[in-house]
Amino acid sequence: MSVTLKVEEREVRPRSLRKQLRHEGKALGVVYGYKVESTPISFDEKELVKVIRDHGENVLVALQIGGKKVNTLINKLDMDIFTPTIKHVEFIAVKMDEETEVETDIVLVGEAAGAKLGGFLSQTLFKVTVAATPDKLPERIEVDVTELAIGDSITVADLPEEKDFRVVTEGDIQVAAVVESTLEAELEEIEEAEAEAQATDADTATDDSEQTSEEQAEENKEDKE
């Protein structure tokens, strides 16, 4: 999968030029890497936002710059934390026949069988590192969890095997598990505690009753004497 993004070389200074570009709806960035010298660039911010929204950050981006095409990956994306705008992007030019490593999202698909019976599906790992040629990098890895019962879990080693890429993250790391609902477990503990308390009270009442009967019998015996 590859998308095309038209970019333009830009001057680093003056600062007012950068402000003007942003005012015009342009985002700023730089491209460097395989057979490419570090080059400051600008591009339509909305176009890249759409690319990321539709394909994720691991998509192969073919930059059209100065009449030539440069195959790149997004190496670093700096977003404004208050507004959904791009502050700066680093594109790294890549060699198409060499593997590269990136992080990709893990997406759980379906409703776990254990969740239908009152369990809770807990995801503990959200990304894994994968290795592939730039054009084979996955947008995400989907994992079917419909067969998971309460007490079952999935590790990295259980992720679907794909011929286009390989998972680099260690296989024994847990991805997700179906656990007993905390609320239900707490209710069970409360019920057990109440049952034990009732049993203790009953035993105490029996002991007290037996003791009272013995004392009464002893008093009656003394009266007769």
Swiss-Prot record:
Acidic residues composition-biased segments: 204-217
Protein's organism: Exiguobacterium sibiricum (strain DSM 17290 / CCUG 55495 / CIP 109462 / JCM 13490 / 255-15)
Source superkingdom: Bacteria
Entry's Gene Ontology molecular function annotations: 5S rRNA binding; structural constituent of ribosome
Entry annotated with the keyword Protein transport: no
Pfam families in the record: Ribosomal_L25p, Ribosomal_TL5_C
Described function: This is one of the proteins that binds to the 5S RNA in the ribosome where it forms part of the central protuberance.
Annotated stretches, region: Disordered: 188-225
Gene from which the chain derives: rplY
Assembly mode: Part of the 50S ribosomal subunit; part of the 5S rRNA/L5/L18/L25 subcomplex. Contacts the 5S rRNA. Binds to the 5S rRNA independently of L5 and L18.
Alphabetical UniProt keywords: Ribonucleoprotein, Ribosomal protein, RNA-binding, rRNA-binding
Disulfide pairings: none
Family the UniProt entry places it in: Belongs to the bacterial ribosomal protein bL25 family. CTC subfamily.
Protein name: Large ribosomal subunit protein bL25
